[in-house]
């Protein structure tokens, strides 16, 4: 090979490497990076985009108003990698079971979980609404689809036991990415204070939900997912393939109730079906809500949703 062809080869390789790195960075910025954002102020309200949420606009705003008017206590913890993570505690009554609640992808606690406070109070539960890393009032700039958030969740569990006492009764609750987070947390060893897990419209794995969305956007996942995964490693400093809710269910021993709207076109209903089938715990239940889109199972069928949770607690033998 003469020098000309060698330079052409080296130039081509260099171009491909540079193009791959640029593509990986673009994927990271679009999919995982979370820039600082201004949250709604007094008299301002945010609801998720899309027609399915506009139908419930009045309810979503009313729930936000409700939790802004309720008394609450602010808490914060330090993550394993030095981020300050924040949450707000809404007490139903002293000694009530406490739900540790986690929101969805690119959401924040007030927007995604306000209705959950109403549901908690109907069940006689208190609620600790938590902003994920890189979301809401918490620090950070990288969303990790539950990979690092599960470690944060476990830290919140330890904090709650210290704060509320060894006799605290705790429930891990999440919606969408928050559901994936609590499910992955449940795959590890959890203390007896955790009584059960509620996973609303969670996905089976980061890879599966990301490739599903890529297909929806008419992007080739066989090409794009490896680039996105590279971006996560290089710029987000985590591995998208490290763990998944599906893997976690193989070792989960806590009771788990899965809830999912049948007409969810973002995280398919079938994902909760498969997660429930994979769950190895003695007590598990799938709450199916016809006609509910993504994250709307409770707004669509409030009484049925609450009653299903009451029945699940009875099936598990809980006296609260």
Q: Could you describe each region identified by the protein language model?
A:
Residues 105-119, 132:
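The serine-hydrolase catalytic nucleophile loop
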Residues 120-139:
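Conserved alpha/beta-hydrolase
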Residues 265-271:
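Conserved alpha/beta-hydrolase "acid-adjacent" motif
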Residues 300-320:
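Catalytic active-site module of serine/aspartate enzymes centered on a nucleophile-bearing elbow/loop
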Residues 184-241, 247:
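Hydrolase active-site cap/lid region
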Residues 13-78:
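An N-terminal hydrophobic leader/cap segment in hydrolases
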Residues 143-164:
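Alpha/beta-hydrolase active-site loop
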């Amino acid at each position: 090979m003469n020098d000309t062809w060698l330079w052409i080869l080296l130039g081509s390789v260099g171009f491909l490497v540079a193009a791959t790195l640029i593509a990986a960075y673009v994927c990271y910025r679009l999919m995982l990076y979370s820039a600082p954002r201004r949250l709604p102020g007094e008299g301002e309200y945010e609801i998720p985009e899309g027609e399915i949420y506009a139908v419930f606009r009045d309810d979503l705003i009313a729930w936000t108003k409700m939790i802004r008017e309720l008394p609450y206590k602010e808490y914060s913890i330090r993550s394993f990698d030095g981020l300050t993570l924040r949450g707000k505690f809404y007490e139903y009554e002293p000694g009530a079971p406490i739900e540790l609640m986690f929101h969805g992808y690119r959401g924040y606690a007030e927007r995604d979980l306000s209705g959950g406070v109403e549901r908690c109070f109907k069940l006689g539960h208190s609620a600790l609404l938590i902003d994920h890393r890189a979301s809401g009032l918490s620090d950070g700039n990288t969303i990790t689809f539950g990979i690092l958030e599960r470690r944060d969740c476990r830290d919140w569990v330890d904090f709650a036991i210290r704060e509320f006492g060894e006799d605290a009764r705790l429930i891990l609750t999440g919606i969408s990415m928050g559901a994936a987070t609590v499910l992955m947390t449940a795959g590890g060893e959890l203390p007896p204070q955790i009584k059960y897990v509620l996973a609303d419209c969670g996905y089976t794995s980061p890879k599966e939900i990301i490739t599903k969305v890529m297909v929806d956007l008419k992007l080739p996942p066989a090409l794009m997912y490896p680039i996105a995964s590279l971006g996560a490693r290089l710029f987000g400093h985590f591995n998208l393939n490290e763990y998944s809710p599906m893997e976690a269910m193989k070792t989960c021993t806590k009771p788990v109730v899965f809830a999912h709207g049948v007409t969810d076109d973002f995280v398919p209903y079938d994902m909760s079906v498969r997660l429930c089938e994979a769950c190895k715990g003695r007590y598990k239940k799938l709450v199916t809500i016809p006609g509910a889109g993504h994250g709307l199972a409770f707004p669509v069928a409030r009484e049925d949703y609450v009653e299903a949770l009451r029945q699940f607690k009875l099936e598990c033998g809980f006296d609260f």
